[in-house]
């Protein structure tokens, strides 16, 4: 301990476990107890890494009778040891019951005592006791037919029992053998060859913060119509005060683009883009340390060899999501084929990733760009903006018809239109800025001083400006404007002169 202090100096602190076990208490040399660090409580998994749902049903009461109404599914869902026990027990009871029935018939007819009489015809030949009756039933049920024991035509009750035995044996065989076949052919073992990465990662992809994990198929047989879904399990409290311990939210992994439909021949990286619609819109690297959530991944598809639907599941808790990591590439191009290296399937490496959430990144982008017009946040502002646009349209429609025709002509100087539109756009952009920025923007630079002074002089005394001082191109434009003004009514000419003065 002293060697560590000499190496690291006074900054070294000893972290000891408190006696109560409720947290960690760091202490430094010559210092009293510091603030107690309470460790984050680990979330109980809803779905294990192997796909098993960690749920137990209790206090069913009378509802347990529903299991008997679907007896076949109940037997299939049982564990193998119980299936084998029921299989052996059912056949043993059925065999003993039918053997007892044949023995009862032989006993009631007196065949057990008269079987050795030469001229006596028993119901079943060569049945003297219960073991011989049991062997006769087994030979008949298994269709072995040794020929030593057989039923005669002098026993109608034996014929009826023989028919009942055949029907009952077929039912038992169909039920138990079918149950065992379905249990053996279940695609649960096929899910063992579908792999999920041990961790999920968050990093930038195509300029967007993205949650990613990897899936793979170890077999050469394909999964037909493979589809993947993701659920976010997180506890929350509603505004009404209701607590939801397992609130399920859908994570978009490409529903609109079809990216959720997988061609699972080689390992694929599943992506969830974190945007304003994502539940992780507010998630940052720092806030993830205090969050508690679970991402459940469900991969479904049809097994190519059997045609049965297979489902593989796994989950990722907040501790299994790595911020600023990316998966190591596993596919390489060899001579004539692609090779997949599954030894690097779970491997990740660090990449530069902003530690901020998408919401924080958007806010910082808005703060760093002051020229961006403020967003319309409520319906009142949106309504006022629409009214302003309608007012501009009304002003243009209230002009005299002659002016409307002149401005609507194709040969109207486009340069003037561009100049006017540029001026108006600049005025609108300056009007959207704060007052301090407007005053700064209104100060002309060295390169624009002459232009601004000349423009001010022209605007202050437009009537005294000589047309001859203008460039030739502007002289023609000014002459055209003078002719257009001469064609205006007297009232409009007076309005124009009042505006200039």
Swiss-Prot record:
Residues 130-141, 142-148 dip into the membrane without crossing it. Residues 18-37 have a biased composition (Low complexity). Residues 1-40 are annotated as: Disordered. It is found in: Membrane. Residues 182-209 are annotated as: Polyphosphoinositide (PIP2)-binding. Residues 106-129, 149-157 are extracellular. The modification Phosphoserine is found at residues 385, 424. Pfam families: IRK, IRK_C. Heteromultimer composed of KCNJ3/GIRK1 and KCNJ5/GIRK4 is activated by phosphatidylinositol 4,5 biphosphate (PtdIns(4,5)P2). Its main location: membrane. The chain crosses the membrane at residues 81-105, 158-179. A motif (Selectivity filter) lies at residues 143-148. The record marks 173 as: Role in the control of polyamine-mediated channel gating and in the blocking by intracellular magnesium. It catalyses: K(+)(in) = K(+)(out). It is a multi-pass membrane protein. Keywords: Glycoprotein, Ion channel, Ion transport, Membrane, Phosphoprotein, Potassium, Potassium transport, Transmembrane, Transmembrane helix, Transport, Voltage-gated channel. Glycans are attached at residue 119. Associates with KCNJ5/GIRK4 or KCNJ6/GIRK2 or KCNJ9/GIRK3 to form a G-protein activated heteromultimer pore-forming unit. The resulting inward current is much larger. Belongs to the inward rectifier-type potassium channel (TC 1.A.2.1) family. KCNJ3 subfamily. This is G protein-activated inward rectifier potassium channel 1. It comes from Bos taurus.
């Amino acid at each position: 301990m002293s060697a560590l202090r000499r190496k690291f100096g006074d900054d070294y602190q000893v972290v000891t476990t408190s006696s109560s076990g409720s947290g960690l208490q760091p202490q430094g040399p010559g210092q009293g107890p510091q603030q107690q660090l309470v460790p984050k409580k680990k979330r109980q998994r809803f779905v294990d890494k192997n796909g098993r749902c960690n749920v137990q049903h209790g206090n069913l009461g009378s509802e347990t009778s529903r299991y008997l109404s679907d007896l076949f599914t109940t037997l299939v869902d049982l564990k193998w040891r119980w299936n084998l026990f029921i299989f052996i027990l059912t056949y043993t009871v059925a065999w003993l019951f039918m053997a007892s029935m044949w023995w009862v018939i032989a006993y009631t007819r007196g065949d057990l005592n008269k079987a050795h009489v030469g001229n006596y015809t028993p119901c079943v030949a060569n049945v003297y006791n219960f073991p011989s009756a049991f062997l006769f039933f087994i030979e008949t049920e298994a269709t072995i037919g040794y020929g030593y024991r057989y039923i005669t035509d002098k026993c109608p009750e034996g014929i009826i029992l023989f028919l009942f035995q055949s029907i009952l044996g077929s039912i038992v065989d169909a039920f138990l053998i079918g149950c065992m076949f379905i249990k053996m052919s279940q695609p649960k073992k096929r899910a063992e060859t579908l792999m999920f990465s041990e961790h999920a990662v968050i990093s930038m992809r195509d300029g967007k913060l993205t949650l990613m994990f990897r899936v793979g198929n170890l077999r050469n047989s394909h999964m037909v119509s493979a589809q993947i879904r993701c659920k976010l399990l997180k506890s929350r409290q509603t505004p009404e005060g209701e607590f939801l311990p397992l609130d399920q939210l859908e994570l978009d992994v490409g529903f609109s683009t079809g990216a959720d439909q997988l061609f699972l021949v080689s390992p694929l990286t599943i992506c969830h883009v974190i945007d304003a619609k994502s539940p992780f819109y507010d998630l940052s690297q720092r806030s993830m340390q205090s969050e508690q959530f679970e991402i459940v991944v469900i991969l479904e598809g049809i097994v190519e060899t059997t045609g049965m639907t297979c489902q593989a599941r796994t989950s990722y808790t907040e501790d299994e999501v790595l911020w600023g990591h990316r998966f190591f590439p596993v596919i390489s191009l060899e001579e004539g084929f692609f090779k997949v290296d599954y030894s690097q399937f779970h491997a990740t490496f660090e990449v530069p990733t902003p530690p901020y959430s998408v919401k924080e990144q958007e806010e910082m982008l808005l703060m760093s760009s002051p020229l961006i017009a403020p967003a319309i946040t409520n319906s009142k502002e949106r309504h006022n903006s629409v009214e302003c646009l309608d007012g501009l349209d009304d002003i243009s429609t209230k002009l005299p018809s002659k002016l409307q025709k002149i401005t609507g002509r194709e040969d109207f100087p486009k340069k003037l239109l561009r100049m006017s539109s540029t001026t108006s756009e600049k005025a609108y952009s300056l009007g959207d800025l704060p007052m301090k920025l407007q005053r700064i923007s209104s100060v002309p630079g060295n390169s624009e001083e002459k232009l601004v002074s000349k423009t001010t002089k022209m605007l202050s005394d437009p009537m005294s400006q000589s047309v001859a001082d203008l460039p030739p191109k502007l002289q023609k434009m000014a002459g055209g404007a003078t002719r257009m003004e001469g064609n205006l009514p007297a009232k409009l000419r007076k309005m124009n002169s009042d505006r200039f003065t």
